[in-house]
């Protein structure tokens, strides 16, 4: 695993964060050291796939990056005729995802597509995964994507939505941000790395509150919505059609 040192030295002109070749190369290390509970979420996606994925249905991993969630789901699917569609708009991520997925043998076909997830049709889905993806979409586009996902899910189909959250209580929000930064420092990131990455993400990642997520999911039709995992200001929700 290549170590993430992208922000370890001062950058004179710090641009917006992008999922380019350099990020794709170090992504597994970056994500493990940056998102508390990430491995637990990936494991649980497999557990949820074993329960909710139905025969002859599709599974979508929207914003699939290097395929961790795709592979977790595929390992646990126990129904025939299932196809997994992974989508990411970063060609370097897609290239590595295809290599990663092809390294593991399975009878379940996986199609990895380089495209904007807003352009993908969701059809005959028993499971859709948005694992730290929605937060990178413009806020005005989030409801329409979730509505499309709801329409494309089978009855009793599931959406797994993992996100970084913000909190309306400013003191609690500040505490959880500080705890997250402490988590990153404990994983070997310097103050400079934490600061520069935060600045790079400011314009491209806009977080919602848990309440805002729940309200929007209910508005598009989901009957059952619950937060099933949280660590500091990161977490994952399940929404059942």
From Swiss-Prot:
UniProt cross-references to Pfam families, sorted A to Z: Methyltransf_25 (PF13649)
UniProt cross-references to InterPro entries, sorted A to Z: CmoA, Methyltransf_25, SAM-dependent_MTases_sf
EC number assigned by the record: 2.1.3.-
Family in the record: Belongs to the class I-like SAM-binding methyltransferase superfamily. Cx-SAM synthase family.
PANTHER family noted in UniProt: CARBOXY-S-ADENOSYL-L-METHIONINE SYNTHASE (PTHR43861:SF2), TRANS-ACONITATE 2-METHYLTRANSFERASE-RELATED (PTHR43861)
Assembly information from the UniProt record: Homodimer.
Protein name: Carboxy-S-adenosyl-L-methionine synthase
Organism for this UniProt entry: Pasteurella multocida (strain Pm70)
């Amino acid at each position: 695993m290549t170590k993430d040192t992208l922000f370890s030295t001062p950058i004179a002109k710090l641009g917006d964060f992008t999922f380019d070749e350099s990020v794709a190369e170090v992504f597994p290390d970056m994500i493990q050291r940056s998102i508390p509970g990430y491995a637990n979420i990936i494991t649980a996606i497999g557990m949820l796939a074993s329960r909710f994925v139905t025969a002859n249905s599709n599974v979508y991993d929207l914003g699939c990056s290097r395929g961790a969630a795709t592979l977790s789901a595929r390992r646990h699917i126990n129904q025939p005729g299932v196809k997994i569609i992974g989508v990411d708009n970063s060609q370097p991520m897609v290239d590595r995802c295809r290599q990663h997925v092809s390294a593991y043998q399975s009878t379940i076909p996986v199609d990895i597509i380089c495209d904007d997830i807003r352009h993908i049709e969701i059809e005959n889905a028993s499971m859709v995964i948005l694992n730290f993806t929605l937060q990178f979409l413009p806020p005005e586009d989030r409801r329409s994507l979730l509505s499309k996902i709801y329409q494309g899910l089978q009855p009793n189909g599931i959406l797994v939505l993992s996100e970084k959250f913000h909190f309306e209580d400013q003191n609690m929000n500040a505490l959880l941000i500080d705890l997250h930064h402490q988590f990153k420092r404990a994983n070997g990131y310097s103050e400079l790395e934490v600061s520069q990455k935060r600045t790079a993400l400011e314009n491209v990642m806009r977080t919602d509150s848990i309440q805002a997520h729940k309200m929007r999911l209910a508005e598009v039709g989901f009957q059952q919505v619950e937060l099933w995992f949280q660590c500091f200001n990161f977490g994952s929700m399940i929404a059942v059609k």
